[in-house]
Amino acid sequence: MTESRIDFRRAKFLISAPDIAHLDQYLPGDVGVEIAFAGRSNAGKSSALNALTEQKSLARTSKTPGRTQLINVFELDAQRRLVDLPGYGFAQVPLALKNKWQQALGEYLQKRACLSGVVVLMDIRHPLKDLDMQMIEWAVASEIPVLALLTKSDKLAQSAKMKTVNEVRLALSEFGDWVQVEPFSSLKGTGKPKVLAILNEWCHPQWLTDELDAANNAE
């Protein structure tokens, strides 16, 4: 079966849930393919989702870091979803709420069988904070590929941008092929084709391709 290209512009809001337990209640089971977006509260996660889907308000942006407290799910088609995870690491969030978010993130990454890939978004000027590394380590430990997306790349000159990209690639080289590193700018569109190509690949895991082939052959 030839790998089809997913039209990410067709993404539409599906549900919000406070944690993975509620996610299981609303979704048709742990099935299909999900790609998760995770990042610190000021990493530009909502802006990146809007830029990648070419929708200005798919994910709601806010000047107040820490606003996204829910797991928000967007549907691409009957088999595939994008999942916007709660922003983490915002200092002014109460400790109890922060711990609740961390628990929800950890449960999702470690227990969600349909998770095909995780995009960990980091401000290119402040990459690889402790919580970023924890997210990456959780995902790789569960054998889930990671795209470390260095956002707001338009904030740096080209030489400084590539210096940071290379430093992050070196720092994450211990994870081998499980982690890819790319610069990205929601404002300028820098890196968008590369990111969409990676997401498209994640949308076509071998098991889903085999399943769809079997269904087509049975018709």
Curated annotation (Swiss-Prot):
Cellular component per GO, a single term: cytosol
One record GO biological process: division septum assembly
Pfam families noted in UniProt: MMR_HSR1
Sites where the protein binds Mg(2+): S46, T68
GO function terms (MF aspect): GTP binding; metal ion binding
Keyword Magnesium: yes
Required cofactor(s): Mg(2+)
Keywords, ordered alphabetically: Cell cycle, Cell division, GTP-binding, Magnesium, Metal-binding, Nucleotide-binding, Septation
Residues that coordinate or bind GTP: 39-46, 66-70, 84-87, 151-154, 184-186
Residue ranges occupied by any EngB-type G domain in the UniProt entry: 31-205
Membership in a protein family: Belongs to the TRAFAC class TrmE-Era-EngA-EngB-Septin-like GTPase superfamily. EngB GTPase family.
Role noted for this protein: Necessary for normal cell division and for the maintenance of normal septation.
Protein name listed in UniProt: Probable GTP-binding protein EngB
Organism expressing this protein natively: Shewanella baltica (strain OS155 / ATCC BAA-1091)
